[in-house]
Every structure is written in structure tokens, then in C-alpha cells.
């Protein structure tokens, strides 16, 4: 079975073709970073219009890369949510239309389920069950995963997501958009210990997160110190250290609570080198294992959507011709694979 996956939930247009026997056959990705850079953030209307321009050409390019035609495709998977409603409608409408024209089934895919299953694209995928840390610009949550569709949310952010806090703090420091990766790069030249940031919500039981206070703390620290490069690097280090420590503490609690020794990390922030390093050290200490996708599959992409859709189409799931777009869609509402 070969599935064409389409991802248009925010500011990346992703298309991929996944074969259940041969694996990933083609992967195309277009980022809108330059389009939104002048605005300092994603402009929904511009994002939607650009998806309209890019999705069909990327589908053609993916088919060409795989050496396939439309007759070789057995199903369509498209991101239906959560995300920006206009952007979701572009991918959903194109996916549904192609499925109708090509006479193949189509399946709406949950964006965060795609991220959660992205490590399954690797040569050594994690086995079920495991604890998943989904950490991106729009979401930060801890999920107990017993199987595909068997998700229990253990904790989530009550305000800003971790990636959002990175980007907002980077903006306070005068870094370009998108600021998160630039802040992490700046932190590499920072001095450990000069500044001490709090570890929010780690002094109480539970697995929820809160990162908006760190942004405020960073703003006050920036205002109260010299505006030189080393000081900014030291602040960046302290901020990143606080976020990573907070995530690690919550992961350790979740693993202890569930009795598991496998941790999966996915989403855009999972590409952060310092976060990977710290979680690897933590898991080694407790005799566990940590899994994450290759860097190119940490951000939004069509490959994870094609893979997730493949699992559900093989399970016999499909939907009617109505276009589905769900800006809000809790992951624990998904049906389990039988």
C-alpha cells in the first residue's frame, strides 16, 4: 500500500509518499519562514495562500521523485487538525479532491499523532508502550502511549508552549524570526551559572507545564543587565537550561508514574541539541531509552502524516467526502487501532 501524505497545518507545506513495504519513497517540504519573517510570526492568511500555490507542485515533485504516477497511489492522508483553520482547509480540500478524482480512500490525520509517530520512520523505532513528550511551538504535552490511538494525556501546558516561549524570548533579545533555533545557537556561547531562572511548576505534584513566566523572567533579566553579546548569550543559556530542566523533571515523573523505561520525544523543539543531550543522560541513568526522529522530521512534514494515515487506512478506517478541518482536536479523542 502506498499513501500520499499532505501537511499544511501552519507554515510548512509537506508532501510525502510512504510504502508499507519499502518505507518512505519521497519527501518534499517547503518552509514559509522567509514569507513571514518581516512580520515576526506566522500570518494565517499569507500561510493559506502560499499553501494553495505550493501543494500541487510538491505532489507532482513527490510522484516524480518516487518514479510513480497517480495510479500507483492507494490512499490519501491529510492533516485535518489541530492548526490554523485556513491552512488546514487548503490541505484538506486538496487531499479530498485528489482522493475523489483518483478513486482512492482518504483519511484525516491528527497533526500531533503524526509527530508522535514520526520516530517510527527510523531504522530502530520504539516499541509500545512508551511515554511521549510532544514539544513544539504550539503544543507541549506528556502522553502515555499504549498503542496507536491509545493515548492518555498526563500533562500539558497551561499557557505558552515551550517552542512559543523560545520564540518570544528570542524576540525580546532582538533575534530574527524564527528565533527559537537562533536562541539555542546563541546559548552555545553562554556561561553556565551567571543567571538562574526558575523551573516553573516543578515544586508541586503533577505533569502540567507553564512557560509564560519564564518569558517574563527573561524580559526582566534583559532589562536589568548590560546589552552586550556575552550577556545575551548567558541569558539565552540560562533560559534554555530552565526549559530543558523543566521538561526533563516532568519526563522523569511521568516515567516513574507509569513504570515505563521508554521515552519518545517529538515535535519541532525535539531538534534542540541541548534537550536531546540532557534526556539521553537522564535515560541512561535510569536504564531506559529515548527515541526521537531525525532532525528533518522534527518540524512539520508530510512523511509523518503519510505514515500515520497508512496505519489507519490499513485498519480499514476512512471517511466520507466531507472536508474535515479541526483547529482544535484533543489527541485523546482519537480511536484506537484495533
Curated annotation (Swiss-Prot):
Entry binding sites for substrate: 134-138, 167, 180, 272
Family membership: Belongs to the KAE1 / TsaD family.
Lineage start: Bacteria, Pseudomonadati, Pseudomonadota, Gammaproteobacteria, Vibrionales
Xref: Pfam families: TsaD (PF00814)
Species of the source: Aliivibrio fischeri (strain MJ11)
Subcellular location: Cytoplasm
GO cellular component: cytoplasm
Entry-linked NCBIfam families: gcp_kae1, T6A_TsaD_YgjD
Entry binding sites for Fe cation: 111, 115, 300
A molecular function GO annotation: iron ion binding
EC number: 2.3.1.234
Enzyme class: transferase
Cofactor dependence: Fe(2+)
Domain of life, per lineage: Bacteria
HAMAP family the UniProt entry points to: TsaD
Main localization category: cytoplasm
SUPFAM superfamilies: Actin-like ATPase domain
Identification of the protein by name: tRNA N6-adenosine threonylcarbamoyltransferase
Annotated keywords: Acyltransferase, Cytoplasm, Iron, Metal-binding, Transferase, tRNA processing
Record text on cofactor binding: Binds 1 Fe(2+) ion per subunit.
Function recorded in the entry: Required for the formation of a threonylcarbamoyl group on adenosine at position 37 (t(6)A37) in tRNAs that read codons beginning with adenine. Is involved in the transfer of the threonylcarbamoyl moiety of threonylcarbamoyl-AMP (TC-AMP) to the N6 group of A37, together with TsaE and TsaB. TsaD likely plays a direct catalytic role in this reaction.
